[in-house]
Amino acid sequence: FMVLICLAAPLFMASLPAWLLQPILTYKYVQPIMRVLTRPLIAFVIYNLTFTLWHIPPIFRVFLYSELWHGALYISVFATTCLALFPVMSPLPEVFPKLAVGKRLGYLLAMLIAHFPLAGVVAFYPRPLYPFYQPQVFGLTRLLDQYSGSAIMAVSLLLTVLTGIAITFVQWLANTEDASHQPDTKHPDPTPEPVVDDPVPT
């Protein structure tokens, strides 16, 4: 999960060329749907709801014992992560605009905070939530493996969000510096009119 969310999806979104996506996402039947799905609140809810539902033990157990559903599980996590990244990494900003810098930072922080309840439950639940812990790698008990998974989830998400915040801040700083070096065309400096001497009478 965390490789898909923290590494694969961001790299995939960053590498998508606009020329490839434009004819697909601007198709008359696709664009209205994508405009709705990529709205920050809707994308945020879809991603977090999907991620949380798949961690409910009975649902997770069903997906583990079926190769077809197991594949659907990972595809859905990857797809909804890409959807959630549109407000901050839109490959077509002229069609699906990115959030302003301040809102982008708030969105990234909200994405991080939204994972805390699930990570907390997995970290502090006194019994193993999932029965599927075979083989036991490095001799870890089921409960210790669960706690380790929660720690990996929290740390990887924290590092990913901090990286996103740092990149956003650097881009904003560069844009601000470029704007400060551009001439102000709206309020040009007043140019003094040339002084013309009165004609000398002849």
Residue ranges and their predicted role:
Residues 2-202:
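Alpha-helical membrane segments of multi-pass proteins
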